[in-house]
Structures are given as structure tokens and as C-alpha cells.
Amino acid sequence: MLNRLRRPAALLLLALALPAAAATPPSPLKVMSFNVRTPADTAPGKRWMDRREALVTTIRQAHPAVMGTQELVKEQADYLASQLPDYRWFGEGRRGGDDDEHMGVFYDRKVVALEQSGNFWLSDTPDVAGSISWGNLFPRMVTWGLFRRVEDGRRFYLFNTHLPYRDEDEPRRVRGAQAIVAHLKTLPADIPVVVTGDFNSEPGGPTYAAFTGALTDARTQVAAPRGPKNTFHDFTGKATTELDWVLVRGFTARDFATVDARVDGILPSDHFPLVVELDWDAK
């Protein structure tokens, strides 16, 4: 009888002495940033009608959970949504309403759920749609979303923007970066953040420094990023400048790709998109 009582106790002690099984790490989050180029071009191969199927194919092959777009207009957004039925999108035109360019954010509703979303303008009056400050030619803005992943309930923010393009706009790009970073500082520190965009500035400059004081360039976290470093190619296929970045807080990139492939000979846009797989940092 005594031996029978001792046996369960011994098994319990043995179980306590064994190292705890390592928890399975969460699956990575796939994010895409894509300047889709407005439908303004009339030359064959650059026209929206000529390249829209290539753009859909590029997104479908990447299959991101979330995607920040730049230069998107509603005509393009509606077409993409019709061809990508698992995706939903949101965003407001930079002048307010549905007109003009959007910083549209797309998300796979089977992978993530949208909990909150909003917009703010990079100006002295960020809550005023279409507001312009600091000498910008056009309204500049951010569209953001708070997402919850369906499989495990993990939450994250995505912020998406497009900064001014002229060489002399660097001070205005810095002001925009500072405004975005100030906004990020108001968010809960335990919820990871991704910032996607066409920043119209290259790494190493003042705009990059303003961002990377609070965020990390995902490309720098990967030992061997795939594809070219530069992203803007003006429909030549040979990129000359690295204008598009993915910046993170609370994530570490495991894979980073600049997608330079043509689809049936067609370039989807004048920018190469970025596709990044992000691991969640341990809390």
C-alpha cells in the first residue's frame, strides 16, 4: 500500500524536475507596402488598364495579411477589392471624402480583424481633412488601423503614409516624420506597430533619422534581404532610389523582399512593392 502511494508522488516530482516544454512561437505577420501609381499615365504599359491585372497578381502572390498603399484612388481601390474578395480596405482621400489620392489600407479579413481605424493630416491641424501646413504643395496624411489577428488574438497597429516628393521638401518630410512619431508615442507600448509608406527620402537622411529614433527599418533586421535595395524605377524596371520603407516597433523581420518581377512582361507600378515577414518580439 505504501509503495502505491509513493509512486504518484515520485512521478509528480519527476515532472516538476523536467524543463518546461518551450512554447510554440507565434506565426509571423506578413505586411506589404505598395505605391500603386495613380491612373494618370497614358502611355502603353503604364496605363492603369494595362497594368491592373499585373498589380492584382503581384498582391495575390504575396498574400499579405495587411497592405499599405500609396497614390491609390477609389477607382483602383474598387477594382482591387473586386479582384481580391478576401480583402477589405479603408481610407479617406487626402482632401477628405472619396476624391484624390488615398493612403488605402487593405487587409485579409480571414487573417485579421479591424478593431479601429482613422486618419490624421500632417499639418498644424491634424484633425482637419485636407489641411496643408509647412509649405507643402498637397495635403499629406496618415491612414491607420488597429488589427487583431484571428488565429491568436494578437493585436498590432499599421500606419501608412506618403511624404512630399520635391528635393526641397526635406524639412517638410522631417516635420511629417516628427508628427507621426509623436502620435506613436501616445499608443500603448505593448502593442506592436508597423509603419509603411513612400517616404520620398532615402535612408541616412534627416527624415530617416527622425523615424529611426523611435522605429527600426525592417530591412536592416534581415541578414540577406531579397531583391534590389532601391524601389523607385519610373517604369524602367531599374530602380534608382530607396524611397519605400517598412518601419517597426515590437516586431523583428525574419524576411524582407523587394518584389521586382514583371507579370507577363508588365510592371505593376513605377515602384517595387515591399513584402516583409515579421516575428513578434517577446513581451
What are these regions (language model features)?
Residues 141-161, 170-199, 207-211:
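His/acidic metal-ligating clusters that form di-metal
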Residues 14-22:
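Hydrophobic h-region of N-terminal signal peptides that target proteins for export
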